[in-house]
């Protein structure tokens, strides 16, 4: 652990220090399973899972148990019946970070690892993309160009959803977003029923405000971080690759990008980055980083080599 010259709410680790905290936590993920979890352009391997994600999964596992003891103590104080061990209060994890930084991969890997623990096997993952306003509503509000910014989300609906899950509702429904259509899928819902753990992944999940926010319901949060220049490079690289994958589908909203030359594609990607994604990152996403329980810092090669844990 890093020695800090002044008192700080954070503890900083390099990868060697962090991996020692894995203790004897077993790796129950195969290479084939990891391939299905890895995002486009990601270079995550089993070694990084062992050295970075297993210690993180162990930390969360310990915090889940501690949180349940805290809920039990509160119930005892209030004279309420002890909670049903088969229906514990769901543990909510937020995963935040920029477009193209790899937060979706982080969320999927955490889901896979945490679900392999017997006492919290029900782990659900929901992305906040489903809580974007439909394109028609964004157009009505004249904020289509601000898609992904905080005002483009139905934050009340998101708050109702997470509150329902946390409160033990029989089920809670999240809208479904299609990246192919670049819009909400009408009538389609993701139904969440009594999870032990809910992972909520999205750009703005750590946002604060004068009223109760979804981040106030988190028990743990992760911010995936990197240099702005590196994230821009990853975004452009992913855009180039998608010309022959997602964009190639005639049904894709972005099918018109599929035939761009490399030079044209780089120009288009850089324009989108500097007009939308970079401003959103600087104005709205990056300022929430200090609120995260854990910051995962990536180097230019995507490898996580530095971590910062909030201890207070």
Curated annotation (Swiss-Prot):
One of its GO terms (cellular component) is cytoplasm. InterPro entries: P-loop_NTPase, PanK, PRK/URK. Signal peptide: none annotated. HAMAP family: Pantothen_kinase_1. This is Pantothenate kinase. It is an enzyme of class 2 (transferase). Disulfide bonds: none annotated. Keywords: ATP-binding, Coenzyme A biosynthesis, Cytoplasm, Kinase, Nucleotide-binding, Transferase. Belongs to the prokaryotic pantothenate kinase family. GO terms for biological process: coenzyme A biosynthetic process. ATP binds at residues 97-104. Its EC number is 2.7.1.33. It comes from the Bacteria. Its main location: cytoplasm. It is found in: Cytoplasm. It catalyses: (R)-pantothenate + ATP = (R)-4'-phosphopantothenate + ADP + H(+). One of its GO terms (molecular function) is pantothenate kinase activity. The gene is coaA. Coiled coil: none annotated. Gene3D superfamilies: P-loop containing nucleotide triphosphate hydrolases (3.40.50.300). Pathway: Cofactor biosynthesis; coenzyme A biosynthesis; CoA from (R)-pantothenate: step 1/5.
């Amino acid at each position: 652990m890093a020695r800090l010259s002044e008192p700080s709410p954070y503890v900083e680790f390099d990868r060697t220090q962090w991996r020692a905290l894995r203790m004897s936590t077993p790796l129950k993920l195969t290479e084939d399973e990891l391939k299905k979890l890895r995002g486009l352009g990601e270079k995550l391997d089993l070694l990084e899972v062992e050295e970075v994600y297993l210690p993180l999964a162990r930390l969360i596992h310990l915090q889940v148990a501690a949180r349940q003891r805290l809920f039990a103590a509160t119930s005892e104080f209030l004279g309420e019946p002890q909670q049903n061990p088969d229906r514990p209060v769901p543990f909510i994890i937020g995963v935040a970070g920029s477009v193209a930084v790899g937060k979706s991969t982080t969320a999927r890997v955490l889901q896979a690892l945490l679900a392999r623990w017997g006492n919290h096997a029900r782990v659900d993952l929901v992305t906040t993309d489903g809580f974007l306003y439909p394109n028609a509503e964004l157009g009505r509000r004249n904020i289509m160009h601000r898609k992904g910014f905080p005002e483009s989300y139905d934050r009340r609906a998101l708050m109702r959803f997470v509150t329902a899950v946390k409160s033990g509702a029989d089920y809670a429904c999240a809208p479904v977003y299609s990246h192919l259509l670049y819009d909400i899928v009408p009538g389609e819902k993701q139904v969440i029923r009594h999870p032990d753990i809910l992972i909520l992944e999205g750009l703005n999940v750590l946002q604060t405000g004068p009223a109760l926010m979804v981040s106030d319901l988190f028990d743990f949060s992760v911010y995936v971080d990197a240099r702005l220049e590196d994230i821009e490079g990853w975004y452009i690289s992913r855009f180039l690759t998608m010309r022959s994958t997602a964009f190639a589908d005639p049904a894709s909203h972005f099918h018109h990008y599929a035939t761009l030359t490399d030079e044209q594609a780089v120009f288009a990607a850089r324009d989108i980055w500097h007009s939308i994604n970079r401003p959103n990152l600087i104005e709205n996403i990056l300022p929430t980083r200090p609120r995260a329980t854990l910051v995962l810092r990536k180097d230019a090669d995507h490898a996580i080599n530095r971590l910062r844990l909030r201890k207070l």
